[in-house]
């Protein structure tokens, strides 16, 4: 049993998207482009189209500029680099259904729901129609539209200010520890996402959900893909 909470009951929950609600992984695309050679694929992703390179697009850099710049550095890899943008839709996996079920519980209970995600402003419109649950959010802040990425505290403040949220009654859920730490430093109630059952227990402890399991979600676990990639 958790200790009784003396602080006010939270009134809003903010979700990260990639790795929490959406399974995103560039390997879904690049396994097709490196058939039978996972080692070469991993080298390409680690040394060419790196996470830091992708994060610059999440911060607002145009994809055309990103592809051109990287292709100039690695002309022998130009077609593979261009595929990251041209075939970006193939990096998307399924919704992480156990977490979607937790989100559905919150939605049906009337809690204010928001999303805060490191994501390119150019590619998010590709993803949005694929995941109907995104319509449950009162607001979605996409880093590429603002020009700031997590864990920069300015992005969290942008969310709080735009929607009039009190950090002390706002819950933030993210699978990235640095993003969770940044939220806590602003006084937000932050939860490091591990899996859907663990998340649900934390939300029960906060008084946001009742006891009892959501419809079948717990058995499925609810983490990201086995490769562990996610939008930041």
Spans of model-derived segments:
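Asp-based, Mg2+/Mn2+-dependent phosphohydrolase catalytic module
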Residues: 1-13, 120-232
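N-terminal helical cap/lid subdomain that shapes the substrate entry/recognition surface
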Residues: 3-101, 108, 120-123
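Generic structural signal for small/hydrophobic residues in well-ordered secondary structure
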Residues: 16-19, 60, 106, 115, ...
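Alpha-helical elements of Rossmann-like donor-binding domains used by nucleotide-donor carbohydrate transfer enzymes
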Residues: 28-29, 52, 65, 69, ...
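Generic structural signal for secondary-structure transition and capping sites
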Residues: 53, 111-112, 208
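Secondary-structure boundary motif
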Residues: 72, 76, 105-108, 129, ...
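Residue-level marker of regulatory loop/turn positions in helix-turn-helix DNA-binding domains and
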Residues: 95, 116, 148
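Proline-centered loop/turn at the N-terminus of a beta-strand
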Residues: 112-114, 189
């Amino acid at each position: 049993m958790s200790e009784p909470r003396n602080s006010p009951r939270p009134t809003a929950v903010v979700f990260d998207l990639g790795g929490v609600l959406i399974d995103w992984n560039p390997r879904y695309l690049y396994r097709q482009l490196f058939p039978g050679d996972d080692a070469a694929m991993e080298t390409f992703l680690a040394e060419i189209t790196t996470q830091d390179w992708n994060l610059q697009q999440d911060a607002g850099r145009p994809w055309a500029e990103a592809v051109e710049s990287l292709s100039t550095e690695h002309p022998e890899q130009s077609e593979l680099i261009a595929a990251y943008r041209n075939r970006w839709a193939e990096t998307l996996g399924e919704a992480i259904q156990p977490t979607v079920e937790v989100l559905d519980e919150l939605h049906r209970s009337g809690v204010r729901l928001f999303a805060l995600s490191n994501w390119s402003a150019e590619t998010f419109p590709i993803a949005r129609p694929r995941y109907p649950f995104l319509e449950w959010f009162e607001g979605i802040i996409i880093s590429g539209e603002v020009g700031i990425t997590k864990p920069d505290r300015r992005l969290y403040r942008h969310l709080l200010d735009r929607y009039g949220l009190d950090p002390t009654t706002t819950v933030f859920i993210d699978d990235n520890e640095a993003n969770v730490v940044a939220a806590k430093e602003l006084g937000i109630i932050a939860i490091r996402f591990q899996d859907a059952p663990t998340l649900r227990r934390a939300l029960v402890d906060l008084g946001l959900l009742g006891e009892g399991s959501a419809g079948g979600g717990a058995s499925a676990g609810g983490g990201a893909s086995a490769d562990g990639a996610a939008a930041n």
